[in-house]
Amino acid sequence: MNDVKGVMLFSFTGELLFKEFVSPLSEEPEKKDWWRLFFLSLNKVNEAELVFEKSRLYIRKTELGFLMILMGCFAPVAMVRLNCDILIPALKQTTTMSGLKRFFMKNIL
């Protein structure tokens, strides 16, 4: 999808299960020890969108943990949600996380 920068899947305890980014990060996300606290603070939140000056972070609760999608300002949020709706049920049935790469496919329209 256009303007999607990265995808991460974390367990409920803050362990990084999967990550994929368009370009390398300056600091690896698994080096942060506050992910568990962050996810605990989400408590019963199923979906959240955090908006920053130059980017957005879409967070979706799954049965495995939290799916986080890092986007630029112009990413189509409706398409991100739709892809999550399709992807999340499939995560339960697979042992690989290759389906998460769908966020990096270009729209053909």
Predicted regions located by residue number:
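Acidic, low-complexity cytosolic segments
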Residues: 1-6, 11-109
